[in-house]
Amino acid sequence: MAAAVDTFLFTSESVNEGHPDKLCDQISDAVLDACLAQDPESKVACETCTKTNLVMVFGEITTKANVDYEKIVRQTCRDIGFVSADVGLDADNCKVLVYIEQQSPDIAQGVHGHLTRRPEEIGAGDQGHMFGYATDETPELMPLSHVLATKLGARLTEVRKNGTCPWLRPDGKTQVTVEYYNENGAMVPIRVHTVLISTQHDETVTNDEIAADLKEHVIKPVIPEKYLDEKTIFHLNPSGRFVIGGPHGDAGLTGRKIIIDTYGGWGAHGGGAFSGKDPTKVDRSGAYIARQAAKSIVAAGLARRCIVQISYAIGVPEPLSVFVDTYGTGKIPDKEILKIVKETFDFRPGMIAINLDLLKGGSRYLKTAAYGHFGRDDADFTWETVKPLKWEKPQA
């Protein structure tokens, strides 16, 4: 890339599964999974909060499932690695509070007519607007800054759990700044400008050991060599000490990492969180179908970069609006792409749930609750499946 080209810097951050907010997301989604596994028609709005030695789950759940909420909380904390007060939370001895009520009957009748409606008649669970985004800068059709920050967080957890870096503790944050070139609306990454990792650690390790291990075992396997150069800046545990972490260090709450969950600051966000919500909540299902639409547009070669917005009214099945913007990278006009999108995708919440198979539990949603909901290579992430779009290339 010629030096004279105008470039800009863009930064995305991530947190790994031991961050207190992410712990809460995972507990909320583990509860959702347990409900859907027994009763696919479960209506779930499950929030979680945590602080030192305490986890509380609260919200509205209507289900035929028999769910042991306390057991789910403790198991989720244990699986992440919160097994003693030293690391930030003791899964077996912390206090667990449960305040779960039924879904409001007013909402229930408006959304699904107390289960009397056919799937295509099911109304949106609330009003709102959601966005999907895709870009051709990575194989995942996701922003590189976000992909790298997310993968660094996942790698931190991997080397903690497999014993490569035994000094690691569950909590940690990452941030990556990428230098980009704007090629007529498409984003072209040139190099990684800055890598920031702040990870919780035990008392035994020195800052020099932390920096050396992070470079060798976390950064090197994740960031392709072509993006690193002698000018790349590394901030590795720049605060100097991060022993106290998890809920002991900071309070946590479901739904506070919505940019990390999506596109790392690229595109746009309607503000609605995902975790702990069943598919009638369009905050979640609407964002999933919008991602599938945007990804399908880019995968089809219709555009190099794309954002899709949809909006809903509570109790109304059809979206109020659908919007497509290709940032000037479209091969045909955006209004024609919009027409193709409307013909290809069914944006009614009941049909989204069926077409994307969103009523299945197990550990399906728990997997989404750390390391991003999009750009993942996993069969359960059905919204990542590209739908073929029919269009004719304009004559040269």
UniProtKB/Swiss-Prot annotation:
This is S-adenosylmethionine synthase 4. Induction: By salt stress, in stems and leaves (at protein level). Follow a circadian regulation with higher levels in the light. Binds 2 divalent ions per subunit. The metal ions interact primarily with the substrate. Can utilize magnesium, manganese or cobalt (in vitro). Binds 1 potassium ion per subunit. The potassium ion interacts primarily with the substrate. GO terms for molecular function: ATP binding; metal ion binding; methionine adenosyltransferase activity. Expressed in roots, stems and leaves (at protein level). Keywords: ATP-binding, Cobalt, Cytoplasm, Magnesium, Metal-binding, Nucleotide-binding, One-carbon metabolism, Potassium, Transferase. Its EC number is 2.5.1.6. Catalyzes the formation of S-adenosylmethionine from methionine and ATP. The reaction comprises two steps that are both catalyzed by the same enzyme: formation of S-adenosylmethionine (AdoMet) and triphosphate, and subsequent hydrolysis of the triphosphate. May be involved in the synthesis of betain in response to abiotic stress such as high salinity. One of its GO terms (biological process) is S-adenosylmethionine biosynthetic process. It catalyses: L-methionine + ATP + H2O = S-adenosyl-L-methionine + phosphate + diphosphate. Homotetramer.
